[in-house]
């Protein structure tokens, strides 16, 4: 998931040996998802010319480079996934998701790696990228798994919205409690 200090957190991952475990997992053809700082870590390099969190080599699972910027991007975002390559994430093709971005930096394709034949698929322009084999996906979109459409696409189950859950709870309370009971239970002594 996300990280407030991407380069520092990546150094911690390396100290724990988790970088090798993530890379091995991807090399075995298993799915990897990076969100926000996780997306930045999946790239080739983190470049910090403003002294925000330091330069660092990435995990190298996506041919991307992130350049940290002093201004933080904070915005609600609605994104529709384009064609997602075959693999663990292909069910997201065409799915609309609501979320938010909150990050320092801009991420883009690593031009030298693309020139050398690396494959990168941009599934949401400027927001989500996928590896050539389809198993590694990185996105800036926080809240991905709070979207019923995303959960439906990925896991095939009807997932109720939070609003539906709260409506059900309210109905239950109305049926089983006398008016004023909850207010009396929560009133200060």
Sequence positions of predicted segments:
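Cysteine-nucleophile active-site neighborhood
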Residues: 4-98
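Short beta-strand segments
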Residues: 1, 103, 140
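Catalytic beta-strand/loop cores that center a nucleophilic Ser/Cys/Thr
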Residues: 85-134
């Amino acid at each position: 998931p996300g990280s407030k200090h991407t380069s520092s957190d990546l150094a911690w991952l390396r100290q724990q040996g988790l970088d090798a475990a993530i890379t091995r997992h991807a090399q075995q053809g298993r799915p990897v998802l990076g969100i926000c700082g996780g997306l930045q870590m999946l790239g080739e390099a983190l470049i910090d010319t403003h002294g925000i969190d330091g330069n660092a080599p990435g995990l190298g699972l996506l041919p991307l480079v992130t350049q940290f910027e002093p201004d933080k991007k904070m915005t609600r975002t609605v994104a529709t996934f384009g064609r997602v390559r075959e693999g663990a994430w292909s069910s997201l093709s065409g799915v609309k998701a609501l979320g938010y971005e909150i990050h320092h930096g801009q991420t883009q394709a690593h031009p030298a790696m693309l020139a050398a034949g690396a494959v990168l698929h941009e599934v949401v322009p400027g927001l989500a990228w996928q590896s050539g084999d389809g198993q590694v996906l990185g996105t800036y979109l926080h809240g991905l798994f709070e979207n019923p459409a995303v959960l439906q696409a990925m896991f095939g189950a009807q997932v109720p919205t939070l609003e539906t859950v709260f409506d059900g709870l309210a109905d239950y309370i109305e049926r089983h409690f006398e008016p004023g009971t909850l207010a009396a239970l929560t009133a200060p002594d």
